[in-house]
Amino acid sequence: MSAVLKPTPTHDHHVADLSLADWGRKEIKIAETEMPGLMAIRQEFAASQPLKGARITGSLHMTIQTAVLVETLQALGAQVRWASCNIFSTQDHAAAALVAAGTPVFAYKGETLTDYWDYTHRIFDFGAKGTDGEGPNMILDDGGDATLLMHLGQKAEKDPSVISKPTSEEETCLFAAIKAKLAQDPTWYTRKSAQIIGVTEETTTGVHRLNEMSAKGTLLFRAINVNDSVTKSKFDNLYGCRESLVDSIKRATDVMIAGKVACVAGYGDVGKGSAQALRALSAQVWVTEIDPINALQAAMEGYKVVTMEYAADKADIFVSATGNKNVIRYEHMAAMKDEAIVCNIGHFDNEIDVASLEKLKWDEIKPQVDHVVFPDGKKITLLAKGRLVNLGCATGHPSFVMSSSFANQTIAQIELFTKSADYQVGKVYVLPKHLDEKVARLHLKKVGAMLTELTDEQAAYIGVSKSGPYKADTYRY
């Protein structure tokens, strides 16, 4: 493949339609009223400006809620450049609103993979009009693609063979983008990486990548695992998916869920929320699991625990929520009923073996909704081409639950940027418990919750401070 990095344009952004900015701004204002955590953090830190001097490269779904996060980081003093971490997840009016306010954003709904990796490169250049000036000193990542780019690019500077054999369309475009950048500047990745203090990572998938690199001793900077903050994983992953999964299936298909058999692959926090949502609409919910503990949890909640092989020709709706690859394979889809609905609410599109379907006939019903036709004439309905269904076919999680996640991200950025000496390069950390509890406190008033206060005697009896933390780090919520 030929080089794919494009000449830098005269404007330092790329969005679908700037005329959508007013619409986006109106929705951002509404979202702010539902995001008390971020708004409280703005108020708390407005004077002290803890992120002054921070140059944050952001790779995270470009939604209305993300716009509130971006403007919170800026309100605390940061410079920000932003791209989406998924080719289908951008809300174009949100991107336009940020650009109209002066933020460099590179994202549009339905990006090509070539554009995706071009934009991921461009968010690392903080010079005037996107020129190759100084780089970021912080990364805010979702899924780990920005972090991956720095690490893989630096490896390729020393050993080009690491980008010589792509195994997927995604890798083909990524490797071509890296080759093009190296042809322009053979040390670009090393220079950009050298300035980076740390990364804060949003998702299970991205954290897995960080932990792998840390274990191998190859992680180039400090990292905070935001995903495993209780106020992220037990809220965003569970309650967020509980609302956004069925929203996306309904928007995409208008199908009646009641009475259907729905098979959820994976019973972690995302799977739990997905299963609850489908059962709430009176589907018969089946679960597949590899972990005996999660499988027993599902069974104790009344779900039928089966294998994908068992469910393939019986279920009507399939949802992958594992963080693994090839969970729903060609042989499973070939066995499915006509018009079975197949979707993924994990981060990457390889949970469903979409590559194995490329040889078949595809019939686009509407954007992000496709019939895939098998040789016998049977069709399955594939949503968002196997990528995140709740952002590809709907607008993602509600603002309130994203306030909790993004409050964690903001606090983690402050923590790493202002206290970098407390965190070791190459290690992955979680936020301290007292900060996790702080995020929860910031959201209680909005839902009318009243917190009981310990007496001195009670605090002494259980051996905690009256102001917390209230649980040991090992406590499972």
Swiss-Prot record:
Its EC number is 3.13.2.1. It comes from the Bacteria. Its cofactor is NAD(+). Pathway: Amino-acid biosynthesis; L-homocysteine biosynthesis; L-homocysteine from S-adenosyl-L-homocysteine: step 1/1. Gene3D superfamilies: Adenosylhomocysteinase-like, NAD(P)-binding Rossmann-like Domain. Substrate binds at T63, D142, E202, K232, D236. One of its GO terms (biological process) is L-homocysteine biosynthetic process. InterPro entries: Adenosylhomocyst_ase-like_sf, Adenosylhomocysteinase-like, Ado_hCys_hydrolase_NAD-bd, NAD(P)-bd_dom_sf, S-Ado-L-homoCys_hydrolase_CS. It is found in: Cytoplasm. GO terms for molecular function: adenosylhomocysteinase activity. NAD(+) binds at residues 203-205, 237, 266-271, 289, 324, 345-347, 390. It holds the Pfam family AdoHcyase. May play a key role in the regulation of the intracellular concentration of adenosylhomocysteine. Belongs to the adenosylhomocysteinase family. This is Adenosylhomocysteinase. It comes from Methylibium petroleiphilum (strain ATCC BAA-1232 / LMG 22953 / PM1).
